[in-house]
A protein has these predicted regions:
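Helix-turn-helix
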Residues: 28-61
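Alpha-helical structural segments
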Residues: 17-24, 43, 60-83, 99, ...
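C-terminal peripheral helix-coil segments that are non-catalytic and often amphipathic
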Residues: 140, 144, 156-157, 165, ...
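Amphipathic alpha-helical packing segments from all-alpha helical-bundle domains
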Residues: 122-149, 157-168, 199
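Hydrophobic alpha-helical connector segments
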Residues: 78-113
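Amphipathic alpha-helical segments used for helix-helix packing
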Residues: 102-129, 141-142
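Basic, helix-initiating cap at the start of DNA-binding domains
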Residues: 1-30, 34
Length: 236
């Protein structure tokens, strides 16, 4: 083994130890703002010098940790977005999870200490939004493929935001419940819920003609814009 390979392995071990120390510190203190280099390195069994050889400070450390998690999450979300609608319909009929969803949830469960701590009350409030934004970036290009033209624009933007936020919210709730359900069970729940309409729960499904609704919404936007322009002009 070359000296460079030895250094790389040592570096990876140090970073892994710091990650584990962060999860333990958060679990113990419950407050990200109380994390400091001294306590972190002491728990990891490393020197402060080792910490600063990898990170500028605690915020930089947290950002790099989160960026690594987000990259792994995005890779798995992209597997889910690659699924075709006929496959999803078949999955729902057979009560099977969407392709890629089990892999995503298994990854989250495998990193439950760190992710759970970051999502928790004393974690990083911005982390949940980062997950939503990262997932949304992965979903949008795929969701636009084959979509009805009149469903694009404002309606589509809010629709994707709603769906992604709801799915991430379920994951957050899963962590709050202590990951009681297995990744396989949770993946089945999330796959089905994505297609449930509120009225379905009460035996009164609400059918919406999306192209018609999209056209009406566009017309209302144009009318609102015209009214606003007229109001501004009259005030001048």
């Amino acid at each position: 083994m070359s000296q460079l390979e030895k250094c790389d392995r040592r570096s990876l071990r140090s970073q892994r130890a710091l990650r584990q120390a962060l999860a333990s510190e958060l679990a113990e203190s419950g407050d990200l703002s109380r994390i400091n280099v001294a306590s972190l390195t002491e728990r990891a069994g490393l020197t402060r010098r080792t910490f600063y050889s990898h990170y500028r400070d605690i915020p930089d450390f947290i950002n790099q940790i989160e960026d690594g998690l987000l990259a792994e999450i995005r890779e798995r979300v992209e597997l889910i977005t690659a699924a075709q609608l006929p496959d999803l319909y078949r999955n729902i009929d057979e009560l099977e999870p969407a392709p890629g969803s089990v892999e995503l949830l298994r990854y989250l469960a495998a990193n439950r200490d760190l992710i759970g701590a970051l999502l928790g009350p004393g974690g990083d409030p911005a982390f949940i939004k980062k997950i939503i934004d990262t997932s949304r970036e992965a979903v949008v290009p795929r969701a636009q493929t084959g979509i009805l033209g009149l469903a694009l624009g404002t309606f589509f933007d809010y629709y994707v935001t709603y769906v992604v936020s709801a799915e991430v919210g379920m994951i957050q709730r899963w962590f709050e419940r202590g990951l009681t359900e297995s990744p396989e069970t949770m993946a089945r729940i999330m796959t089905v819920i994505a297609f449930v309409r509120p009225g379905d729960l009460y035996g009164q499904p609400i059918d919406i003609n999306v192209p018609e609704y999209g056209m009406k919404l566009l017309n209302l936007q144009l009318e609102d814009a015209a009214d606003t322009a007229a109001t501004v002009e009259s005030n001048n």
